A protein has these predicted regions:
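Mixed-charge, Lys/Arg-enriched low-complexity segments
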Residues: 46-88
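DE-rich, low-complexity intrinsically disordered acidic tracts
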Residues: 17, 37-45, 72-76
Length: 88
């Protein structure tokens, strides 16, 4: 298993990618949490498909900064992991 989804200590939820490039990011659905994003910080929005909600990733903490990694593919996989989590 390369994903861990759990509560964030400050509230809300976080996702952790346990394989390189390793990272932890907070995430939410619905409206973009602009008040939670630092100016100049990396964030990602997955628009969803059909009835799926938009997923926003923010407050990234990189253990292994992504070097030569397809960020879109990594974020698509992150969104899929969250969809699986939500569907239970």
């Amino acid at each position: 298993m390369s994903w861990c989804i759990e509560d964030h200590p400050d509230g809300g939820l976080q996702i952790t990618h346990l394989a390189a490039p390793r990272f932890t990011a907070r995430w939410t659905t619905g409206a973009f949490p602009i008040d939670q994003v630092r100016e100049g910080a990396f964030f990602w929005t997955d628009e969803g498909h059909g009835l799926d909600d938009t997923i926003h990733f923010y407050a990234f903490e990189w253990t292994d900064p992504p070097d030569n990694v397809d960020i879109k593919r990594l974020m698509d996989r992150s969104a899929y992991a969250i969809e699986v989590y939500v569907m239970g």
